[in-house]
C-alpha cells in the first residue's frame, strides 16, 4: 500500500537533497548503494581513506543524516519501496 504521508515526505526530502551532492560525493553514495563497505571505497575510487571520510561527512550533512547507519537505513527503505532509482 501507500506510505504514510509523513514517511513519504521524509523520503521525498532525502531524495531532493541528493542534488546538493558533488559528483565525487554521488560516486561515494553509489558505492554504498551497491553494497560496498567503507574499507573498499579507497581502492574502488582511487582516493585515500581520509578523502572518503571527508566525502562521508559532507554527504551526511547534505542528506541530513547523522551516520552511515542512518544513510544505509534510508537506502534500504528506498530500495524496499521501489524508489532507489531516484538516487541516481
Q: Can you describe what each PLM-predicted range is?
A:
Residues 1-3, 31-32, 44:
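N-terminal start-of-chain detector that recognizes signal peptides
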Residues 2-27, 84:
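Regulatory hinge/linker segments at domain boundaries
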Residues 5-6, 41, 79:
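N-terminal functional modules and adjacent low-complexity/disordered segments of proteins
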Residues 11-14, 34, 46, 88:
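Phenylalanine-focused residue identity feature
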Residues 14-15, 57-88:
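Basic, Lys/Arg-enriched C-terminal extension of HTH/homeodomain DNA-binding domains
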Residues 25-32, 71:
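Short alpha-helical "packing" element that flanks the helix-turn-helix/winged-helix DNA-binding module
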Residues 32-36, 75:
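Short helix-to-turn junction characteristic of helix-turn-helix DNA-binding domains
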Residues 35-70:
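Recognition helix of helix-turn-helix DNA-binding domains
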Amino acid at each position: 500500500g501507500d506510505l504514510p504521508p509523513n514517511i513519504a515526505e521524509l523520503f521525498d526530502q532525502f531524495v531532493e537533497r541528493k542534488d546538493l551532492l558533488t559528483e565525487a560525493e554521488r560516486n561515494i553514495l553509489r558505492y554504498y548503494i551497491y553494497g560496498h563497505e567503507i574499507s573498499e571505497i579507497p581502492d574502488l575510487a582511487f582516493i585515500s581513506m581520509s578523502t572518503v571520510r571527508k566525502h562521508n561527512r559532507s554527504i551526511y550533512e547534505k542528506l541530513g543524516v547523522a551516520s552511515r547507519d542512518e544513510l544505509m537505513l534510508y537506502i534500504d527503505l528506498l530500495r524496499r519501496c521501489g524508489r532507489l532509482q531516484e538516487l541516481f
